[in-house]
């Protein structure tokens, strides 16, 4: 599900947004986007839908406002793409790569960007069983979310 308008919204920037919907992995919450004209509303709706589809389909977060921006190439054959969101602290990338090394998994590509607080790394790996890697990545201290994109 995706939600853009909420019964009780923050009244100003920086105010914490609290809703029980934040607990669910299958819910996407976007900021309420106002528009002055029907055309602007349509265009904003189209742009938001395109950005969500791009994130959903390939992991790109280009033009994200409060999240690290990562622009990704098209899907490559014979790789699995993993998404890892973590606290931006020293040592996370080392631990991620140590897991791949211990499992003898070749990393085809890694794309990392950070903000002051959050790190977002997208990894294309050569593995027939990427589902075995995710539980290990989730155990890394500071991991906020990790999943297989494809």
Question: Where in the sequence are the language-model features?
Answer:
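Rossmann-like dinucleotide-binding domain for NAD(H)/NADP(H)
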Residues: 1-74, 120, 150
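A conserved regulatory-domain signal marking ACT and ACT-like small-molecule sensing domains
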Residues: 62-150
């Amino acid at each position: 599900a995706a939600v853009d308008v909420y019964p009780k919204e923050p009244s100003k920037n920086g105010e914490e947004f609290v809703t029980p919907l934040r607990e669910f992995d299958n819910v996407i919450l976007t900021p309420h986007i106002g528009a002055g004209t029907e055309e602007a509303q349509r265009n904003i709706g189209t742009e938001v839908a395109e950005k969500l589809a791009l994130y959903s389909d390939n992991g790109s977060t280009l033009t994200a406002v409060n999240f690290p921006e990562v622009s990704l190439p098209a899907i490559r054959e014979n790789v699995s793409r993993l998404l890892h969101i973590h606290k931006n602290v020293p040592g996370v990338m080392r631990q991620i790569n140590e897991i791949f090394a211990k499992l003898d998994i070749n990393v085809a590509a890694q794309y990392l960007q950070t903000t002051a607080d959050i790190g977002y790394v997208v990894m294309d790996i050569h593995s027939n069983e990427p589902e075995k890697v995710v539980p290990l990545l989730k155990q890394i201290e500071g991991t906020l979310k990790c999943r297989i994109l494809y």
